[in-house]
Regions:
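Alpha-helical scaffold elements adjacent to nucleotide-binding pockets in ATP/GTP-utilizing enzyme cores
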Residues: 22, 74, 78, 109-113
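Short, glycine/charged-enriched secondary-structure capping and boundary segments
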Residues: 25-26, 51-54, 111-115
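Pre-Walker A (Motif I) flank of P-loop NTPase domains
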Residues: 4-8
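Residue-level signature of catalytic and energy-coupling elements of molecular machines
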Residues: 15, 41, 75, 100, ...
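Short beta-strand-centered segment that lines the nucleotide-binding/catalytic pocket of NTP-utilizing
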Residues: 33-49, 124, 128
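Phosphate/Mg2+-binding loops and adjacent switch elements
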Residues: 85-142
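A conserved segment at the C-terminal end of the G1
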Residues: 9-12, 17-38, 42
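Conserved nucleotide-sensing/catalytic segment adjacent to the nucleotide-binding pocket
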Residues: 54-81
Length: 142
């Protein structure tokens, strides 16, 4: 790993608002080939990871709860494990991380982890938060 901090991008929004579509569009660009993708799923069986076209060597799927609530520690573990596995040569080098939250997530605890946790802030920096909105039903969901 280099000494520079890796940017983290968080994609969030309600169910059906286009998060996975946006992610698919992003990962189709050659400039994004060295990106680690973390897809958060809620419930027993996740489906978003099956909808994301296989563009990366390493997609980490967190499916045992919502990132914002019950597995915030797992986000920390996942980001740390990605860095360690890269350092050990187990996965390809990556220059950025994209986290797609579940449509049920409140992104606040995720952002808190990314901005405050010393283990994370040593290696990563929150770059941006992208919120998708269903243009037809968005107003009704607010």
């Amino acid at each position: 790993m280099t000494n520079s901090k890796r940017p983290v991008y968080v994609i969030t929004g309600f169910l059906g608002s286009g998060k996975t579509t946006l992610l698919n569009h992003l990962v189709s660009h050659v400039e994004m080939k060295d990106t680690a993708v973390i897809i958060n799923e809620f419930g027993e069986v996740g489906i978003d990871h099956m909808l994301v076209k296989s563009s990366f060597e390493d997609v980490v799927l967190l499916k045992n709860g919502c990132l914002c609530c019950t597995i915030r520690g797992d986000l920390l573990d996942t980001l740390e494990t990605l860095a360690i596995r890269e350092e050990q040569g187990e996965i390809p080098s990556f220059s950025r991380v994209v986290i797609e939250t579940t449509g049920l997530a409140d992104p606040a605890p995720i952002l808190q982890t990314l901005m405050i946790d010393p283990i994370i802030t040593e290696r990563y920096v929150l770059n941006s938060i992208v919120t998708t909105i269903d243009s037809v039903n968005g107003l009704a969901q607010l």
